[in-house]
Amino acid sequence: INSMLALRDALSSGYDEALILGTDNSVNEGSGENFFMIKDNKLITPELITVLDGITRKTIISLAKDHDIETIERKIDLNEVYECDEAFFTGTAAEVTPIIEIDKTKINNGIPGKVTKMLQNDYFNLIRGKHDKHNEWLTHLNKT
């Protein structure tokens, strides 16, 4: 219910989504998504202590590894997010959604970043069966 209330509050304040924070001002997740940021070509995401261990989250971490992008799971202070190079949400419904602004602070000059777009493209290709790796993650259905 906290997620629903946070989203309702965000929407009524003119935002598209909520960023759920811990009592220590650490970033946990969106109202229904996992949170990632890119800083110095490293993929950073909150540790699993406070967030859902999402399938899409695991997929993005694997895809980043395919590109030799280091993934760091740790506590993220909200102030760090304002200084990040890129940010995005992941989830079953969100898939890979770039974040271009948080609290009126533009991320990457208000445009999706190159790493975000690369991982988003890889993810879309993967779920459509057009990716070179991880074919074992898919169940192909026969046309009837």
Which ranges hold each PLM region?
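Helix-start/capping segments and mature chain N-termini
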Residues: 1-144
